[in-house]
């Protein structure tokens, strides 16, 4: 039997129908069992084989047999495991949002760095061109003074071309300064659902592969589950607290009742012991009185015998 088939049987039938060698070492309600897994919404399982599994890692036990045991027990009474599962999902969404913020910040820093480097490079280009323009302007004046009009006009045209080049560089620099993440200068943007970096210049099919991937779909479903559970979480927490409070009150009353019953029995046993001791002391005194009475009668009889003998003599 393959591991997959074994897991399917365990998930359907529960731990009672699993071989002893493969039976979980703890019950489904043990604190080490993942309660989000029991409800089928553990974030770690929602993003399989992706980098987000390290972000939303889960160290609790995931046993298919536990899930079947829980579903069977849940029909008997409400365990309120959705409250614990919500807290797990909420924490996972928070961690992913932190990861997304880090990626976005990195992209923005990269754009700023690239913008600064590009600006420095273009400033250097402009300085070199302006130096050429200054030199050629001096040459134009010299040629004009010498009457070389045709050569002067050629240099003048060249200087105008250099000035147009400077304008093009300055215009492109303005575009870079106003650019941000997601623009043509950055090319990359971050997916707001799962934090993946997307290149907007990629082919549509490649971008579609991302949106259809396990990591993206898993995080979208996790966020949807989180928002849905958030609508009723306050009410569910209140219900659980009321139930736990009722159970604690019942347990206290039972504890007090056992102590009271134990006290009554103790008093009853104490009374019986005291009665028994009193009876023993009474019997002991009676025996002592009888012994003393017999001794007195024997003494009186001996005295009478001695008096009778004395008279005869």
From Swiss-Prot:
Region of interest called Disordered, as start-end residue ranges on this chain: 237-313
Single Gene Ontology MF annotation: mRNA binding
A GO BP annotation: mRNA splice site recognition
Domain of life: Eukaryota
Coiled coil: none
Pfam families tied to this protein: LUC7 (PF03194)
Listed GO CC annotations: U1 snRNP; U2-type prespliceosome
Family under the similarity heading: Belongs to the Luc7 family.
PANTHER family for the chain: RNA-BINDING PROTEIN LUC7-RELATED
This protein's name: LUC7-related splicing factor homolog
């Amino acid at each position: 039997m393959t591991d997959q088939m074994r897991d399917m049987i365990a998930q359907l039938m529960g731990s009672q129908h699993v071989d002893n060698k493969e039976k979980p070492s703890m019950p489904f309600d043990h604190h080490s069992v993942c309660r989000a897994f029991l409800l089928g919404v553990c974030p770690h399982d929602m993003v399989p084989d992706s980098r987000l599994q390290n972000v939303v890692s889960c160290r609790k036990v995931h046993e298919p047999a536990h899930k079947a045991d829980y579903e069977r027990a849940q029909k008997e009474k409400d365990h309120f495991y959705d409250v614990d599962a919500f807290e797990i999902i909420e924490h996972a969404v928070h961690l992913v949002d932190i990861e997304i913020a880090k990626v976005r910040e990195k992209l923005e820093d990269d754009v700023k760095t690239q913008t600064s480097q590009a600006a420095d490079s273009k400033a250097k280009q402009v300085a070199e061109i302006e130096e050429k323009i200054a030199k050629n302007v001096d040459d134009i004046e010299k040629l004009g003074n010498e009457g070389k009009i045709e050569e002067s006009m050629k240099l003048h045209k060249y200087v105008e071309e250099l000035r147009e080049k400077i304008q093009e560089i300055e215009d492109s620099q303005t575009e870079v300064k106003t650019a941000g993440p997601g623009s043509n200068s950055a090319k990359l943007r971050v997916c707001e659902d799962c934090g993946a970096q997307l290149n907007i210049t990629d082919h549509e099919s490649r971008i579609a592969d991302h949106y259809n991937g396990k990591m993206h779909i898993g995080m979208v479903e996790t966020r949807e589950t989180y928002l849905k559970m958030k609508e009723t979480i306050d009410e569910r927490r209140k219900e659980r607290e009321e139930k736990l409070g009722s159970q604690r009150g019942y347990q206290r009353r039972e504890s007090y009742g056992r102590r009271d019953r134990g006290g009554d029995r103790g008093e009853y046993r104490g009374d019986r012991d005291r009665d028994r001791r009193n009876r023993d002391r009474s019997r002991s005194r009676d025996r002592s009185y009888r012994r003393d009475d017999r001794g007195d009668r024997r003494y009186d009889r001996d005295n009478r015998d001695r008096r009778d003998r004395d008279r005869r003599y």
